[in-house]
Amino acid sequence: ANWCEPGLVIPLNPLPSCRTYMVRRACGVSIGPVVPLPVLKERCCSELEKLVPYCRCGALRTALDSMMTGYEMRPTCSWGGLLTFAPTIVCYRECNLRTLHGRPFCYALGAEGTTT
């Protein structure tokens, strides 16, 4: 069994601030009340930091998956943009958080299996 499955180590609806942050950064639009970008980034990094490093990439993937169902995308936004930006959230210039790869890095979120 994969212990990074949503509902175990990863919450069922993970990283709410990161979802908003991804949309703001990748699409330039806001969902819900407009929170200043640095505040949103801080909240997102804090949510990610609470997760074990092994499951951080998987949590980002789960957050994106949950957005794909029942989520209205604006014409200015593309899943491609979100998929490209999402894995960079753990990187040095963003949250700088270690992952299962032992450094601040996630593979492209569509590229790995469910263990990431």
From Swiss-Prot:
This is Alpha-amylase inhibitor 5. GO terms for cellular component: extracellular region. It holds the Pfam family Tryp_alpha_amyl. Alpha-amylase inhibitor. Its main location: secreted. InterPro entries: Allergen/soft/tryp_amyl_inhib, Allergen/tryp_amyl_inhib_CS, Bifun_inhib/LTP/seed_sf, Bifunc_inhib/LTP/seed_store. GO terms for molecular function: alpha-amylase inhibitor activity; serine-type endopeptidase inhibitor activity. It is found in: Secreted. Belongs to the protease inhibitor I6 (cereal trypsin/alpha-amylase inhibitor) family. CDD domains: AAI_SS. Disulfide bonds join C4-C55, C18-C44, C27-C77, C45-C95, C57-C106.
